[in-house]
């Protein structure tokens, strides 16, 4: 069971809501994934019409919403988006995203740390999206973040665990849950992330852009489960040379 702040999750696969062809496909994919935590960008919500076509069906599914500050260019904008989410959605949970570069969407470490400090002081449950930087992740822990969400590779790139060496360090040192976010493009990559010891993964593009999003969601669900079980079972140690599975005995000389 995964616990973040005061909430427990049976599923270690978190999902997003962007890039789906329509809301019905999105809902069916979320159901198939068995995800219990779903991110939604504040910039996509039309509060003028109350509970819009995005929020209403998500609440009917029964998942916990994790509003994000995607689109924020600095700490001030991110804090504003988080406070809007708390007021309009009634949640203290926030996925903190600050990426001023519209091309590569790389997170701004300095602004993210500052926003995290402010939001934690205001009582938010903060899950920051950041570079796979062990030092930064430790600093975010220290200011009170409930989890850290280091990237595997650029958002939506499907490149997989490009930052694996750094993710290993973060997982080793973390005292809060580590959710690997961004760039996971295949179920095998999600399984690998879980084998490393990640507490969860967040997948959106790889599911939403698939020719069969519902089937792909099921595949990711199973991959995450298998990866976690493999981690808990204990993977064999990697050797530099060959190791005999059946050591030679003297029977050949008899």
Curated annotation (Swiss-Prot):
InterPro entries: Aldolase_TIM, Thiazole_synthase_ThiG, ThiG. Keywords: Cytoplasm, Schiff base, Thiamine biosynthesis, Transferase. It catalyses: [ThiS sulfur-carrier protein]-C-terminal-Gly-aminoethanethioate + 2-iminoacetate + 1-deoxy-D-xylulose 5-phosphate = [ThiS sulfur-carrier protein]-C-terminal Gly-Gly + 2-[(2R,5Z)-2-carboxy-4-methylthiazol-5(2H)-ylidene]ethyl phosphate + 2 H2O + H(+). It is found in: Cytoplasm. Its EC number is 2.8.1.10. The keyword Cytoplasm applies. It comes from the Bacteria. Catalyzes the rearrangement of 1-deoxy-D-xylulose 5-phosphate (DXP) to produce the thiazole phosphate moiety of thiamine. Sulfur is provided by the thiocarboxylate moiety of the carrier protein ThiS. In vitro, sulfur can be provided by H(2)S. This is Thiazole synthase. It comes from Shewanella sp. (strain W3-18-1).
